[in-house]
Amino acid sequence: MDLPEPVRLDCGRKLHPVRVAYETYGTLSPRRDNVILVCHALSGDAHAAGLAKTPPAESTRDGFGAADRDGTAAKGLGWWDGMIGPGKAFDTNRFFVVSTNLLGGCRGTTGPSSADPATGEPYGPDFPVITVADMVRTERAFLDALGIERLAAVAGGSLGGMQALEWAVLFPDQVDAIVSIASTPALHPQGMAWNAIARESIMRDSAWQGGRYYGTGAAPDAGMGMARMVGHVTYLSAPALADKFARRLQFADDIRYTLTEPEFEVENYLRHQAGSFVKRFDANTYLYMSRALTYFDLARQYGGGSLRQALAGVRARTLLIAFSSDWLYPPSGSEDIADALRDLGKPAEIHVIEAPYGHDCFLLEEARQTPIIQRFLGHGGQ
């Protein structure tokens, strides 16, 4: 869908035209009051559930072991298929679920690989630097164009959870509930550092060409692959890696004394993830999304440094789900949000699930999240 009006951005620029790629699941009620917006993480897209009409060459299902754990990834199964559908956490027998590709994306929504109307060429580094708030304003404009004024809920994990929180702050009168999973009120310095390493890996690849690699026949695949390796390590926990790979060798019964080949299973896994990712994701989009993650800070943006003040206007019921082994977005961040909301007398429910997979738990622990979300959406939470 092409938005009818320009999108105003935090950097001071206006972006137009803006196209938003989206998918929907379920049936919109006559009163248009059963809409749930689901928001994807850094490398996701609008295809959240079901089988893609045109299966992608590579799976878009992120998550440790999630890429083909049910044998359907090659068919293009949506990244949150286990959570969206009849009888699932986001029950399409009750709700009309909408999923969009984020502003700045590379899966159909306007981003750095889109044509700049001023030149007819891809924006590249001339695309404006965006924030999570810009993504949410774009979603709001998109829903306006669909004729949807109010949301029953906004839900997402990781960056998607940040968007849910941003919705509650920016549009307090337009969303009834939020479900923020494996998220945080602000990325902590360690997470910022890992993001910086990933971005540097891309920008130091000579094939990046200052971000103007489109149409040149070259792309920063080496740097992008390195960024993906870094990302995957941050998504996992040490016990999960040890359980899956231990120190098993990949191709031999003994070491080969080579510098260039992946001799251990864990090395081969990371190389495979890198190779798959560069086939389906744009390096500039990765840079823009990573920067938006780093900027996100509710207390700084809306509370003068106080999270409590930033959340003072929130009216949505809030469900927070965190995971014990998630060191990238640790449970303490969700606990801080819950504490601030409760101090303000606002309804907030938090669950910390004991699970070993690290940040990827939000994609892997669907069965344990489902009853929590169903109760929250069905019975008003706590």
Describe each PLM feature range:
Residues 23, 31-116:
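N-terminal cap/lid subdomain of alpha/beta-hydrolase-fold enzymes
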Residues 120-126, 133-153, 162:
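Conserved acidic catalytic loop of the alpha/beta-hydrolase fold
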Residues 150-193:
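Conserved hydrolase catalytic core segment
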Residues 174, 180-276:
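Alpha/beta-hydrolase-fold enzymes
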Residues 276, 296, 325-329:
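Acidic catalytic loop of the alpha/beta-hydrolase fold
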Residues 301-307, 330-341:
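Short alpha-helix in the alpha/beta-hydrolase fold that links the catalytic acid
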Residues 314, 320-322:
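Short beta-strand/loop motif that positions the catalytic acidic residue
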Residues 335-382:
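Catalytic active-site module of serine/aspartate enzymes centered on a nucleophile-bearing elbow/loop
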